[in-house]
Amino acid sequence: MRKWLSCLMVLVMLTVPMIQADAAEKAVLALGADLSADQRAVVLSEMGISEEEAASYQTIYITNDMEHQYLDSSIGASVVGRHALSSVLLIPQESGAGLSVETHNINYCTIAMYKNALLTAGVQDAKVIVAAPSQVSGTAALIGAVKAYETYSGEEVAQDAFETATNELVLTGELMEELDSEQISDLIAYLKQKVAENGLDDPDKLEELVKQAAKEMDMSLTDAQISQLVDLLLKLSKLDIDAGKLVSQAKELYDKLDDLGIELDTKKVGNFVTRFVSSIWELIQGFMSRD
């Protein structure tokens, strides 16, 4: 019996690096098309990868035209600029691992902002590294992350989901100029969760939800800000967002909401992989106790 258990444990331990290696092989590098050779070297260094490693990844290029296509209506052509520099490395993770984000030389978009917007676009189970050769806002990096995910998954992100994700990122940034950035990200995450859970699509009910959530978080919103959030929630209500996936993909964010005393009906949603490994370990312990 112990020999069988030893073999099982070896198999489990061997499977983990195999999954990680497979994920690395499928990684997608989305580079700003206007990077110079020196800027490219800086970006790769910030991402923690060598030229040799980069050569093994599937590489796509994000052009300035693409940035204007997706961002002009939200932030204006002059803000988008004329050079595509923001770059993204997307490394797929095993199912249930969730979505993680790290940033380098990004001075405007926060990790929580990226997470919220990427979840809206449908990105999941991935490690996303956003980097630029020098300090930039990072708004355009959302395009690189989504396009990298499309390349990896082989599925195109729905246009309405992409547009809503962009709108969410931009609105979060605008509100962040007048309010606390963490609070805004927490508020939008909570509102999105409630819309997904309850299928809310009535403007009056959404306005009531925004006001109640702001009160619980001790935030003071103007009528204009409330209206902007309601407009965003109406767009989110038209998307097929899975409430359970929101929690499992951004567990730290939703755990934080719980710590703030803001309850989510989907707290019962756990990480399947964690529960599976735990069950296997309990089974092994049960067998060993019989010897």
Protein language model annotation of sequence segments:
Residues 2-22, 280, 284:
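Sec-dependent N-terminal signal peptides of Gram-positive bacterial secreted proteins and lipoproteins
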